[in-house]
Design a protein with these regions (language model features):
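ATP-binding glycine-rich phosphate-binding loop
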Residues: 13-36
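Active-site activation/catalytic loop segments of kinase-like enzymes and analogous catalytic loops
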Residues: 214-243, 252-271, 281-286
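Active-site acidic catalytic loop and adjacent metal/ATP-binding pocket
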Residues: 27-35, 42-43, 161-215
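A conserved alpha-helical element in kinase catalytic cores
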Residues: 41-82, 104-122
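C-terminal, non-catalytic tails of nucleotide-sugar-dependent glycosyltransferases
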Residues: 278-300
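Conserved protein kinase catalytic core
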Residues: 50, 97, 183, 210-212, ...
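An alpha-helical support segment within catalytic cores of ATP-dependent transferases
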Residues: 4-14, 125-176, 186-189, 196, ...
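Conserved short submotifs of the Hanks-type protein kinase catalytic core
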Residues: 85-97
């Protein structure tokens, strides 16, 4: 039976919104399945009044509006309704997340790897409306902050500063948060043959913006690559072919130091910390060596 959770405004029914199932509720947001004026819909409602998350919510709304004005080269849910404050009503997409864990425990098959990488590559190559996007964060500030927190040595920071000086301004559009849970897969049937055709749908655009080349790849390399070595191999090939070694090494460092912080902040007996922290530490050891090597090499 349809109902409105107490978190949602009482006016939901007056705009033709009904809620069938609450899919997930965190301290930040409520995600539900329902219908909007007879059309299946996903409902995302901001619970946390923190100004940071309010700003991210407004940013995600802006991204959906950009996509409504200028069609992106990747599949996204359509924006059906918003109250411009806390409520997003989106087209319901029949697809499943790549995984629910931040670090998936299953290995992706070749079809899934191809679909994910093709999707991210298409987004990165898109000629986006330049006036509508800006850098998601300041790389120099991020590096300084993580050194102050103890996640970077002086030598590592110097290497990162050296690469930053080479890379120029962030100008590549990236999703910004391609967690496995934000990558939905929908295996349909191809019109030309009997094989299943895997479509990727990207959701949660709160951190979308301009980055140095390869940020999304750095996240996939770190998280999905932990259980799927072939995606790391494919990403390394893309990095080499496109000549973005310095930017990618920088992005890896940014991603991995954040992962170290997030997992060190978990309780010591937390199962996720116990499982993932050794993976992250091993990846950071390798990435740090790579960083120093590239920083020491003379630019071509």
């Amino acid at each position: 039976m349809s109902h409105t959770p107490p978190d949602l405004p009482g006016s939901a029914a007056t705009i033709g919104l009904t809620i069938d199932t609450v899919l997930r509720r965190t301290d930040k947001t409520l995600l539900a399945r329902g219908s909007f004026r007879g059309e299946p819909a996903a409902v995302k409602y901001l619970i946390d009044p923190d100004p940071f998350w309010a700003a991210r919510w407004r940013h995600e709304l802006n991204v959906y509006e950009v996509f409504g004005d200028t069609t992106p080269p990747v599949r996204i849910p359509r924006l059906l309704h918003t109250d411009r404050d806390r409520l997003l009503v989106l087209e319901w997409v029949d697809a499943s997340p790549l995984a629910v864990e931040r670090y998936p425990q299953r290995e992706l098959d070749t079809r899934e790897v191809n679909a994910v990488l093709d999707c991210i590559t298409a987004l990165n190559a898109w000629t986006y409306p330049a006036a509508r996007f800006s850098p998601t964060f300041d790389y120099s500030e991020r590096v300084a902050r993580y050194q102050a927190k103890g996640y970077l040595t002086e030598g590592q920071r110097e290497a990162l500063d050296s690469l930053l000086a080479r890379c120029g301004a962030p100008a590549q559009l990236n999703h910004g948060d391609p967690l496995a849970s934000n990558i939905l897969l929908n295996a349909g049937r191809s019109d030309s043959d009997d094989e299943a055709e895997t479509t990727v749908v990207l959701v949660d655009w709160e951190f979308t913006g301009l980055f140095l080349p390869g940020f999304d790849f750095a996240m996939l390399h770190t998280q999905v690559g932990a259980s799927t070595p072939v995606i790391r191999e494919r990403i390394e090939a893309i990095v080499s072919e496109t000549g973005i070694e310095a930017a990618f090494a920088l992005n890896l460092a940014v991603v991995l130091t954040r992962e170290l912080r997030l997992h060190h902040e978990l309780p010591e007996d937390d199962p996720t910390r116990k499982r993932c922290l050794p993976i992250i530490e091993a990846a950071w050891t390798s990435a740090s060596t790579r960083l120093q090597r590239i920083a020491a090499a003379r630019p071509a």
